[in-house]
Amino acid sequence: MKKNQFLKESDVTAESVFFMTRRQVLKALGISAAALSLPHAAHADLLSWFKGNDRPPAPAGKPLEFSKPAAWQNDLPLTPADKVSGYNNFYEFGLDKADPAANAGSLKTDPWTLKISGEVAKPLTLDHDDLTRRFPLEERIYRMRCVEAWSMVVPWIGFPLHKLLALAEPTSNAKYVAFETIYAPEQMPGQQDRFIGGGLKYPYVEGLRLDEAMHPLTLMTVGVYGKALPPQNGAPVRLIVPWKYGFKGIKSIVSIKLTRERPPTTWNLAAPDEYGFYANVNPHVDHPRWSQATERFIGSGGILDVQRQPTLLFNGYAEQVASLYRGLDLRENF
């Protein structure tokens, strides 16, 4: 990993920005409630032009002990904590970007159980404390690219997924890794009400090929900005795969299962022509309803000050991950 090769100063979200929520924008534009149940990126271009002042506070989780390996650090200013904790997609708590911060306090994250099962020789169960104590934690500054064509730069804290999988000892039959979010409708209003939850089928599920899961970049994430993850960011543990669109970063994980067959994934089930299994960041493969050739940085100004820059293949991590897809048609396997 070459230090600082993926980021430049313009990548970093400025301090003053925070956008109006999706529901406020859609209501103002006369878009019906039924339209809110469409796949989450449908109205992204509308949302991104507005900003408001109802920014929630930065996360106040428990401080974590972690190292800062030089390979994953840089000297650039970061997207401020209140932006990462206040501008989220977590449909279990609502469709608006501010809904997770407003509603996720109902999620009980301790006690917690994460089970690793399936095609493994040694099934494992981790509790809440294991998530921050079982493996050495490290801070990694990654670019985060949403399928909605906006991005942030975030200092995540966690451990490589391959270390956890190695303890479980995948069998020779294991080809994929399936992930599942907690199902707790009494705590997650979006799991109770299809209009709050975007019409998705819950619990949220995701998947990777085994070689993707074992890649050193793939991070089991338990913290951000030096502290334990806040609920709206996927506490107590979420997945970060920095070369893929953000919806692959499943939150509040309770199950990891190694499988022989490719597992179903939530957004691919909801709209298979729009959200593929791989979901690699690719400027040459557009979403059916908007271009992915450029991305919008959440800047400090208003509508006239929004800046774009070219989207990087694999979100700038091509040197590390392109070999995983050698011989694969990335347009067909999007």
From Swiss-Prot:
GO molecular function: metal ion binding; molybdopterin cofactor binding; oxidoreductase activity, acting on a sulfur group of donors, quinone or similar compound as acceptor
Keyword Hydrolase among UniProt keywords: no
Main location: periplasm
Residues making up the signal peptide according to the UniProt record: 1-44
Subcellular location: Periplasm
UniProt-listed PROSITE patterns: TAT
Posttranslational modification: Predicted to be exported by the Tat system. The position of the signal peptide cleavage has not been experimentally proven.
Essential cofactor(s): Mo-molybdopterin
GO biological process, one term: protein repair
Cofactor: record remark: Binds 1 Mo-molybdopterin (Mo-MPT) cofactor per subunit.
Listed name of the protein: Protein-methionine-sulfoxide reductase catalytic subunit MsrP
Lineage: Bacteria, Pseudomonadati, Pseudomonadota, Gammaproteobacteria, Enterobacterales
